[in-house]
Curated annotation (Swiss-Prot):
Function: Transfers and isomerizes the ribose moiety from AdoMet to the 7-aminomethyl group of 7-deazaguanine (preQ1-tRNA) to give epoxyqueuosine (oQ-tRNA).
Entry-linked InterPro entries: QueA (IPR003699), QueA_dom1 (IPR042118), QueA_dom2 (IPR042119), QueA_sf (IPR036100)
Coiled coil: none
PANTHER family named among the record's database cross-references: S-ADENOSYLMETHIONINE:TRNA RIBOSYLTRANSFERASE-ISOMERASE
Quaternary structure, from the entry: Monomer.
Entry keyword S-adenosyl-L-methionine: yes
Enzyme Commission number: 2.4.99.17
Gene Ontology molecular functions: S-adenosylmethionine:tRNA ribosyltransferase-isomerase activity
Protein name: S-adenosylmethionine:tRNA ribosyltransferase-isomerase
Keyword annotations: Cytoplasm, Queuosine biosynthesis, S-adenosyl-L-methionine, Transferase
Length: 366
C-alpha cells in the first residue's frame, strides 16, 4: 500500500540552515562533493562520500549520459519607466512579432502603455502591452527583430544580466560563464540545469575515454523554476509546461545503449519521460511542451539512474527524486548531507543515484 504521506506536500518539508545554501561555485567544477546513495534497506549513514570526479569510477563503459544543452539567457533587465522609476524585467518566452512574456518587479508599477528604457541605453525602448493573468507577468514589445531566443540573445548579452536564483546573494561577472554548462548550446533558459554545472572539460574527456556515451536533449528551464508548489494534495498537482526537444539521435542513442541510461539533472528526466509519455510510454522523438508530474508512484519508462543537486523543500524536484528512491530515504539522506556540511541548491553539491539503488517497482521494464 502506498504511504498517504507521499502525496502530501507538507511531507516534503525539511529544515535547512541558511549557511548551507551555496553562494558561489567551487573550482574546478568536478571538485563539488558527491553523496552516493546507498542501496535500499541500508541506513543513510552508510552513504559514500566523494567528489563529482568519482563518476569516472561510478559510470561504466556503455553507459549513456543524457544531458540538457540549453543555454541560459542574460534575461534580467534593469529598465526605467517613463516617470523615471527603476524596475526589473525577467524575459521569459517569445509570443510572436517581438512580443515577450516577462516577469516585472515591482509588477504593480508596470502598467499597459508604459514606455520602458533599458537602463544604461538611450536607444532601446520597450512598451508594456498587457498584463498576463496566467503568469502574473507582462507582455512587452521588444524590437521586432527579437523574434526568438536566438535573435534576442545579442541584445540581452549587451544589456542584460544572468538571472541567478533569488537565494544566491551575489553579482559576479564570472557567473556569465559559471552559470552555464560546458556543453550549453541552444539559448532559451532563464535558469541553468544545475546538475550539469559539475562537468568540467577534463571530466567529460575522461568519461568519453572510458567509453561512456553522451546524448543531448534540450529543455528550456522556464518560469516554473521560480514558482513553489502550493498544492497540499499532490494528487491534484499540476505543473508548468516547459519546451523540450528530444531528437531522433537521442532516441537512437537510448535504443543502442549497451549499459545504463543516466539522466544528468531533473530536466533531463522530465524531457525523456515526457517524450515517452507523449507516445504511450515508448520513447520516440518529440518536440513541444511537457507538463509531466513525476512523484512517488510514477513508473519510469526510460531513466535508470540520476545525477542531481540538492533541491528546495516542498519543490516539484524533490518529488521527482523521491519517486526514484522513496521520500523517507531521500529526507534521511538530506539530513545526513546537512550534518556533513554539504552545499545545497544551484551552486551546491550533488547526489548520485545509481540504477541499483532505485526502487525496483519504479524501474523501467526491460
Amino acid at each position: 500500500m502506498p504511504d498517504p504521506r507521499d502525496l502530501q506536500l507538507s511531507s516534503y518539508d525539511y529544515p535547512l540552515p541558511p549557511e548551507r545554501i551555496a553562494q558561489a561555485p567551487v573550482e574546478p567544477r568536478h571538485s563539488a562533493r558527491l553523496l552516493m546513495v546507498p542501496p535500499q534497506g541500508e541506513p543513510s549513514t552508510d552513504a559514500a562520500h566523494g567528489q563529482v570526479w568519482d563518476l569516472l569510477e561510478q559510470l561504466q563503459p556503455g553507459d549513456l549520459l543524457v544531458v540538457n544543452d540549453t543555454r541560459v539567457l542574460k534575461a534580467r533587465l534593469a529598465v526605467r519607466r517613463s516617470g523615471g522609476g527603476l524596475s526589473e524585467l525577467l524575459v521569459l518566452e517569445p509570443r510572436g512579432e517581438g512580443r515577450w512574456l516577462c516577469l516585472a518587479r515591482p509588477a504593480k508599477r508596470m502598467r499597459p502603455g508604459d514606455i520602458l528604457t533599458i537602463d544604461g541605453s538611450t536607444s532601446i525602448s520597450l512598451t508594456v502591452l498587457a498584463e498576463d493573468p496566467a503568469s502574473g507577468g507582462r507582455l512587452v514589445q521588444f524590437p521586432s527583430d527579437c523574434r526568438d531566443a536566438e535573435t534576442i540573445e545579442g541584445l540581452l548579452n549587451d544589456v542584460g544580466e544572468v538571472p541567478l536564483p533569488p537565494y544566491i546573494e551575489r553579482h559576479d561577472p564570472s557567473d556569465s560563464q559559471r552559470y552555464q554548462t560546458r556543453y550549453a548550446d541552444r539559448p532559451g533558459a532563464v535558469a541553468a540545469p544545475t546538475a550539469g554545472l559539475h562537468f568540467s572539460d577534463e571530466l567529460l574527456a575522461g568519461l568519453q575515454q572510458k567509453g561512456v556515451d553522451l546524448a543531448r536533449i534540450t529543455l528550456h528551464v522556464g518560469l516554473g523554476t521560480f514558482r513553489p508548489v502550493e498544492t497540499e494534495d499532490l494528487t491534484a498537482l499540476e505543473l508548468h509546461s516547459e519546451w523540450v526537444d528530444v531528437s531522433p539521435a537521442v532516441v537512437e542513442a537510448v535504443q543502442a545503449c549497451r549499459g545504463r541510461v543516466i539522466a544528468v539533472g531533473t530536466t533531463s528526466v522530465r524531457a525523456l519521460e515526457g517524450a515517452a509519455q507523449a507516445h504511450g510510454g515508448v520513447l520516440k522523438p518529440y518536440t513541444g511542451p511537457v507538463d509531466l508530474v513525476i512523484q512517488p508512484g510514477y513508473r519510469f519508462a526510460v531513466v535508470q539512474g540520476l545525477l542531481t543537486n540538492f533541491h528546495l523543500p516542498k519543490s516539484s524536484l524533490l518529488l521527482l527524486v523521491s519517486a526514484l528512491i522513496g521520500r523517507e530515504k531521500l529526507l534521511e539522506l538530506y539530513h545526513e548531507a546537512i550534518e556533513r556540511d554539504y552545499r545545497f541548491f544551484s551552486y551546491g553539491d550533488a547526489m548520485w543515484i545509481a540504477p541499483e539503488v532505485v526502487l525496483p517497482e519504479v524501474q523501467p521494464r526491460p
